[in-house]
Amino acid sequence: MAVSERRGLSGESPAQCRWEYLSLLVLMLSGCSGRIHRLTLTGEKRADIQLNSFGFYTNGSLEVELSLLRLSLQETEDKFPKVGFSLSRVRSGSVRSYSSRNSHECPLERNSSNFLVLFLINIKDLQVQVRKYGEQKLFISPGLLPEAPSQSGPPKPDPTGTPKDNHVIHPSPKKMSAVKEDQAKLTVPQVSGDKALPAGHRHSSDGQPQSQPPTRGPSGKEKDLVLGLGHLNDSYNFSFHIVIGSRAEEGQYSLNFHNCYNTIPGQEQPFDLTVMIREKNPEGFLSAAEIPLFKLYLIMSACFLAAGIFWVSVLCKNTYSVFKIHWLMAALAFTKSVSLLFHSINYYFINSQGHPIEGLAVMHYITHLLKGALLFITIALIGSGWAFVKYMLSDKEKKIFGIVIPLQVLANVAYIVIESREEGASDYGLWKEILFLVDLICCGAILFPVVWSIRHLQDASGTDGKVAVNLAKLKLFRHYYVMVICYIYFTRIIAILLRVAVPFQWQWLYQLLVESSTLAFFVLTGYKFQPAGDNPYLQLPQQEDEEDVQMEQVMTDSGFREGLSKVNKTASGRELL
């Protein structure tokens, strides 16, 4: 299970609960480091752990440091490696590649023609075997990249003068000298007392592994790279880095950890794992699909701010037709703008530093929570007709609000957990399913007040004699119902399909569709329910109009129509009956 901390919120005063909730946000963010991931698992029993997924461009780098791996005694005595990492290139928006395989099949024991790299941890020989499948030119080297590369330029020629093929693993052209310096530091004489190791697998005094370069077999073909595995007390450690060598290797990559000893149900053995993952593209720490999000969220924040300012100006010009719900709509637009602004700032710092600023991240989550609650409350209030034509909610409508508001709080908590936790955490998938289910329930619940209002207007249009006004309101509610359906359809279903269909570098179109659909929904809702005198939603039949309708019915029933005329109060001239 993932290392985490929990705080209770029961038995507190409302003010204390608010401070506890804010402290909970800070606590959850304390373990989040953006695109520099640190995952600690203790007593874990899963056989497959999806550590992370990232979109790489050319010269992008992946660094992995396994600082602690503690297995049971039975697992360390097995000669064939059944523990290790896998790096595979996956399709954008797809689930992990091993999700559809047999649960008893070990992905480390099968050969694959797909784009795949395996890191097999051999506990007995204290080494890590690197196996590559498919045509690829990934540069795999031991150790981590230096903080700042010492020099850049073309790769140095091989001193042996032998040709290289796809199985040769050499460092990135931009980090050649830095990697050689790191490897030179590892050539420390073996300390007495260590276990006898094969040639090329020496350990320094601190238990750090030393690797041997690829050697050539009898057939002249380069062998797989072998990394040294460090052994300190009862734990193991090693590190490596990968550089994307060409455009052919660009794509979405998924890094997974496998413990094939736990594939058989009922025979799982707990293990401990601590790993650091650092992913970087030439432009920063953001994935290929996330690089445009900083500018996208900043532009959309300005659009929502402009829409909110324009809406407030409309409210100030029509003071006599303004209701409380109109100001609630203005608050929603400004809250959405501020939330997107903080989201944009977070992506900026993640791209430049690898992690967000905790204070700004907390502000983003608070405004995101307020925005989500205001959105669903506003949609439900407009659909129920509150403040426009009535100031009391029915029992059914109160139950809807009693369901939607707590679910929105739960959905925002799930969103915060997903954003702050690592993908490899044991409860990450559970919170993701909770967010999807709760969001689906909320989207369905907000439709009920609109449907009830439509049925009420249908019944009232044939009984109270106010046919024209009720039919106009009925038409408006039907339009609003279609608008809500389209908003849910575009921001949930169409957006997910778009995310699966487009290439990895165009994944940001998903967020563009969601934010554009939200802005269009806000604008159309404001246009339909603007505080104007000719808005049928705000019109109530006047007493003189009711008398005219009653007089017209009397004259029609009595037959006194011939030669009579009525003065039209809204137009010059006369209108023949």
From Swiss-Prot:
- Parts of the chain that traverse the membrane: 296-316, 325-345, 369-389, 400-420, 434-454, 482-502, 506-526
Does the entry feature the keyword Signal, yes or no?
yes
* Region spans: Disordered: 144-224
How does this chain sit within the bilayer?
Answer: Multi-pass membrane protein
Source superkingdom: Eukaryota
* Main subcellular localisation: Golgi
Q: Which InterPro entries match?
A: GOST_TM (IPR053937), GPR107/GPR108-like (IPR009637)
The record's Gene Ontology biological-process terms are: negative regulation of toll-like receptor signaling pathway; regulation of immune response
Is Signal tagged as a keyword? yes
Entry-linked Pfam families: GOST_TM
Assigned GO CC terms: cis-Golgi network membrane; Golgi apparatus; Golgi membrane; membrane; trans-Golgi network
Give start-end of the signal peptide: 1-34
Question: What UniProt keywords are attached to this protein's entry?
Answer: Glycoprotein, Golgi apparatus, Membrane, Signal, Transmembrane, Transmembrane helix
Q: Where in the cell is it found?
A: Golgi apparatus, cis-Golgi network membrane; Golgi apparatus, trans-Golgi network membrane; Golgi apparatus membrane
Q: Which residues are glycosylated?
A: 59, 111, 233, 237
Q: What does this protein do?
A: May play a role in intracellular immune modulation by activating NF-kappaB response and attenuating Toll-like-receptor response.
> Into which family does the record put it?
Belongs to the LU7TM family.
Q: What is this protein called?
A: Protein GPR108
Species the sequence originates in: Rattus norvegicus
Lineage summary: Eukaryota, Metazoa, Chordata, Craniata, Vertebrata
